Every structure is written in C-alpha cells, then in structure tokens.
Amino acid sequence: MRNSSNKYLDLPYRPGVGMMILNADNQIFVGKRIDTKISSWQMPQGGIVPGETPSIAAMREMLEEIGSNKGYIIAESKCWYSYDVPSFLIPKLWNGNFRGQKQRWFLIRFTGNNKDINIHTSNPEFDQWRWTSLDELLSIIIPFKRKLYQAVVKEFESLIQ
C-alpha cells in the first residue's frame, strides 16, 4: 500500500513562470501572500495559459501581480525549475490537479518607480510588498520554495550588477 504522504506523487507539475524583478538599485521585488496567516514572502509567479510562451506569460503575470509591466527581460533561465507543495496544500490549490509547479524563471529589470506598483489588483495575491537584497531573499522565502530560489539565485546572480 502506498504511503499517504506519497499519494500525490503521480500528479503532474503545473507549468508556470517566475519573475526575479530588479529595481534600479538591484533590489528584488517580493510580495507577502494574501492567502496565508504565516509570513509567506515570494517573488511573483504564475501559470502559463495554453498557447502562451513563457516570456509572454512572465510579462502578463508581472502586470497581474504587481499592477505594472514597466520593464524588460534581461535573461531567461536555462532550464525549468520545479517544486512540490506540502501535501496538505495540494487539495486546496489548482483543484488538487498538480503536485507543485515547474517554472521557467525570468530576470526582469523594472523601469518604473514605486508609484507604478499596485498590488491591489482585481485578483490580488499580495497584501504587502517590498524590495529586498539578494542576501536577504533566501532567508524570508517560504521554506518549501527555498531550494528552487537557491537555484534561481545561483543562475542569475552574475547578471545582477
């Protein structure tokens, strides 16, 4: 018999994108998730609509999550990164159809200013936002995404001048 903690292993990953958005000072945008009581900071991310390219999805998600798409893509990750969500969350997310996400990540230079950011969108995901340093980023991220974030930071850190 299968261990109940492994009952979701046959589920696929949801295809998505993640954005490491940099301001002019090379600080990274993070938002505090609105749907949890614990302090869950993360970089913007979201799903890919069928027929959409990852780069188009990244710019669309940026607009949907931070209320602005003022920026341009500096780099795209060389591979897809994936993470599993904790098993207790699976039934609550994506109708229980996915075990986690596989994401293409984008390093984006934000060309707007703080006044251009509006997290109070039609479907808000964040209730707070801030700019953080590369050094602080990994310490404030929700633990189940930390390994993915470490890989993304490793790939992009040489491009953050």
UniProtKB/Swiss-Prot annotation:
Monomer. GO terms for biological process: mRNA catabolic process. It is an enzyme of class 3 (hydrolase). Its EC number is 3.6.1.-. This is RNA pyrophosphohydrolase. Keywords: Hydrolase, Magnesium, Zinc. Gene3D superfamilies: Nucleoside Triphosphate Pyrophosphohydrolase. It comes from the Bacteria.
